[in-house]
Every structure is written in structure tokens, then in C-alpha cells.
Regions:
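DPxDG-like acidic metal-binding loop motif
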Residues: 63-72
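Polybasic, low-complexity association/targeting segments
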Residues: 1-17
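Transmembrane alpha-helix interface/packing and boundary motifs in multi-pass membrane proteins
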Residues: 47-56
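Acidic-glycine-rich active-site phosphate/pyrophosphate-binding loop
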Residues: 1-2, 29-47, 100-106
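Active-site nucleophile and cofactor-binding loops and adjacent substrate-binding regions
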Residues: 41, 56-61
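An acidic intrinsically disordered interaction segment
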Residues: 17-37, 92-99
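C-terminal binding/interaction regions
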Residues: 85-148
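Phosphate-handling active-site elements
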Residues: 32-43, 71-86
């Protein structure tokens, strides 16, 4: 049997649990990429689920995925404008979500009807995890990440 995919790990943490989309994405990425992020870091991401706990903001799973991209592409001492690789990855992830789901807005995403899924968030979070794994593995011309 091959290595488990990121989206499968996200689903294990998200479907049938009390974890929000953000918490599931954080825990799965931390484990999958061997990031060894601290409990303090987990707490920082914990309020990002449910559209920053208000449903009026950006999808929590997307927000955590953006943080993971930054963590894995930024160099020590580098500013945002210097991290072109991360910026390109962020653009690819944003384009994917907007093209696939039409919005980044949590409450609008929760209102989608997805055949075969009781909760549309499960489908959306799974899709974000698949795209994140593709991007970080070097898909679409991005450099191969050295974390796997």
C-alpha cells in the first residue's frame, strides 16, 4: 500500500470529528509534512475555522493552507515581496478555489450543494488539500519541496 495522501489525512481529522476545517488542515499538514509545529502554533490556527469563527470571512482550511505555503517557502529574514515562489503557489491555490467553488467566503461555501457529500465543507477541504499537496510536491512547474 502506498503512502497516505494529504487529503485522506485531512478527511480523517475532519469527517465525523469535532475539528473545524482549519484544525483538520493544520493537524494533517503538520503530520503529513513532518513539520513538528508546536501546540502554541496549533492554538494560533485554531480560531481560523468557520471563516475565522464568524462565517463572515475566508475559508479556514484555505487560510491554514496559505500559512503552510508561507512556512514551507519563506526563507529566514525574507520579506513577503522576496518570496515569489510562495506568492506563485498562493495564486495557484486561490485560482483553484475560485474556479472550483466560486468564492473563498465561508458562508457561501457552506451553502453549496455537492452531490455525494452531506457537508459541502468536506468536499471543499478535500479539494484544497489535494491542490495544496500538488502545489507543494512540485506540480505545475513549482520547485520540488524538500519536506517529503
Amino acid at each position: 500500500m502506498g503512502k497516505i495522501k494529504l487529503y485522506e489525512l485531512v478527511n480523517q481529522y475532519h469527517i465525523g470529528t469535532e475539528l473545524t476545517c482549519a484544525e483538520a488542515m493544520f493537524k494533517a499538514c503538520n503530520e503529513y509534512y513532518g513539520l513538528n509545529l508546536s501546540e502554541e502554533t496549533r492554538r494560533m490556527f485554531s480560531v481560523m475555522g468557520l471563516g475565522m469563527q464568524t462565517e463572515q470571512s475566508c475559508c479556514g482550511a484555505f487560510t491554514v493552507a496559505v500559512g503552510i505555503i508561507g512556512l514551507m517557502t519563506a526563507k529566514d529574514g525574507e520579506t513577503d515581496v522576496d518570496n515569489m515562489e510562495g506568492y506563485q503557489m498562493l495564486c495557484a491555490l486561490t485560482d483553484y478555489v475560485l474556479t472550483s467553488f466560486g468564492t473563498l467566503h465561508c458562508v457561501e461555501l457552506q451553502g453549496l450543494e455537492v452531490q455525494g457529500y452531506e457537508n459541502p465543507c468536506h468536499y471543499i477541504v478535500e479539494g484544497i488539500a489535494k491542490k495544496l499537496e500538488e502545489i507543494l510536491s512540485g506540480g505545475h512547474g513549482y520547485s520540488q519541496m524538500l519536506v517529503n
